[in-house]
């Protein structure tokens, strides 16, 4: 009986952990819930004309290039 109870507890913990999804900033103030396979929040600048740069934020599977890339793996860490 104890073995069955322990097995049920372990299965429950595993199922809860597998259901976790990351939340990242997208743009300046908006947030987005990442897809299950996207495990990284990123932030970087895209060069634009006249010396300006555009901020890019979101979810990804790997750290992208760009100017001053920042990548992290916790909720809302890309601000």
Curated annotation (Swiss-Prot):
Signal peptide, first to last residue: 1-21
Location of this chain's protein in the cell: Secreted
Disulfide bridge partners, by residue number: 24-41, 34-59, 63-71, 72-77
One GO CC term, this protein: extracellular region
Pfam families in the cross-refs: Toxin_cobra-type
Swiss-Prot/TrEMBL keywords: Acetylcholine receptor inhibiting toxin, Disulfide bond, Ion channel impairing toxin, Neurotoxin, Postsynaptic neurotoxin, Secreted, Signal, Toxin
UniProt entry tagged with the keyword Transmembrane helix: no
Main subcellular location of this protein, as a coarse class: secreted
MF GO annotations: acetylcholine receptor inhibitor activity; ion channel regulator activity; toxin activity
Described function: Binds with high affinity to muscle nicotinic acetylcholine receptor (nAChR) and inhibit acetylcholine from binding to the receptor, thereby impairing neuromuscular transmission. Compete with the binding of alpha-bungarotoxin on muscle AChR (from Torpedo) with an IC(50) of 0.31 uM (SNTX1) and 3.1 uM (SNTX5). Is able of exerting muscle paralysis, spasms and increased respiration.
Similarity comment text for this entry: Belongs to the three-finger toxin family. Short-chain subfamily. Type III alpha-neurotoxin sub-subfamily.
Protein name as catalogued: Short neurotoxin 1/5
């Amino acid at each position: 009986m104890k073995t069955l109870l322990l097995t049920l507890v372990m299965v429950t913990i595993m199922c809860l952990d597998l259901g976790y999804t990351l939340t990242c900033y997208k743009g300046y103030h908006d947030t987005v819930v990442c897809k299950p396979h996207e495990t990284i929040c990123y932030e970087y600048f895209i060069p634009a004309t006249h010396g300006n740069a555009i901020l890019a934020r979101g979810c990804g599977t790997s750290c992208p290039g760009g100017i001053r890339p920042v990548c992290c793996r916790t909720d809302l860490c890309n601000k």
